[in-house]
Regions:
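Asp-based, Mg2+/Mn2+-dependent phosphohydrolase catalytic module
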Residues: 1-17, 108, 112, 121-239
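Active-site neighborhood of HAD-like aspartate-dependent phosphohydrolases
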Residues: 2-56
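Conserved phosphate-coupling serine/threonine residues in phosphotransfer and NTP-handling enzymes
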Residues: 26, 118-120
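Short beta->alpha linker loops
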Residues: 33, 58-62, 98-102, 120, ...
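An amphipathic alpha-helix signature
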Residues: 35, 39, 55, 63-68, ...
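Helix-loop "lid/cap" segments that line or gate small-molecule binding pockets
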Residues: 41-42, 62-76, 128, 162, ...
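Short helix-capping segments at alpha-helix termini
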Residues: 44-48, 73-76, 133-137, 166-167
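Metal-dependent phosphoesterase signature
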Residues: 68-105
Length: 239
């Protein structure tokens, strides 16, 4: 499926009918918390994984995908591992989760239809958005990998969300922070902009990572979303 050329900010509404936001790392600053829980829980089951590897291997992936990964390596995890992980993450979120700075202002002022599509299960998405005060902005517009046969990097979730929202793939923009999410959006025939404003990209070259995955542009602050700028696609973080 052919995607139209990358638009300027002034052309956004003309080019797009729908913006799909990923949740973790885009709407909420959750990836460090989630990956810390994963590393700690795996350690309890005698599986060693450092935080950087957790970002690289599992950012944007579902709990089922994580279990399948280790099963494929011959490392069996308990049948209730996914439930254990979600319980640990929920506790961490209740204590420490915050929304990405300025994302609420962006959403309230956005003049394009939008929704959220995440690899997380519906209960976790709902809880995360409620904790951060964003839940009311997505009423009836929440889509989970639970709804489709294959999660990211397969295109199923984004295609499902776009279809439910009445938008064609080529007129849909996806905002993603993970390699698997970028790959899923491109496989769906959608435009994708990488977001590197989450805490998990503080010491990583997020621009290079997401551009290599196929992202059309990369930005690091929600206040920059959709603004015409000569340095769109350039990582202004000096590392």
């Amino acid at each position: 499926m052919q995607v139209p050329p990358d638009p300027s900010a002034a052309d956004m509404k003309r080019c797009f009918d729908l913006v799909i936001f990923d949740c973790d790392g885009v709407l909420i600053d959750s990836e460090v918390l989630s990956c810390q829980c994963l590393v700690e829980l795996l350690r309890c089951h005698d599986v060693v994984l450092d935080l950087e590897s957790a970002y690289t291997q599992f950012l944007g992936r579902s709990g089922v995908a994580i279990v399948d990964h280790y099963t494929g390596l011959g490392r069996s995890l308990p049948a209730d591992f996914g439930a254990e992980l979600q319980a640990a993450i929920r506790g961490s979120f209740a204590r420490s989760l915050r929304a990405i700075p300025n994302v609420e202002t962006l959403l309230r002022g956005l003049d394009i239809t939008y929704c959220v599509a995440s690899s997380s299960d519906l209960e976790r998405i709902d809880f995360s958005l409620a904790v951060t005060g964003l839940r009311g902005l997505f009423e009836g517009r929440i889509f989970s990998a639970d709804m489709v046969p294959e999660g990211k990097p397969a295109p199923d979730l984004f295609l499902h969300a776009a279809a439910r929202m009445g938008a064609r793939p080529e007129r849909t923009l996806v905002i993603e922070d993970s390699v698997s999410g970028v790959q899923a959006a491109k496989a769906a025939g959608m435009r994708v902009w990488g977001f590197i404003g989450g805490s998990h990209y503080r010491f990583r070259n997020g621009r290079a990572l997401l551009m290599a995955a196929g992202s059309d542009r990369v930005f690091e602050r929600m206040v920059d979303f959709g603004q015409e700028s000569a340095d769109w696609g350039h990582d202004s973080i000096q590392r």
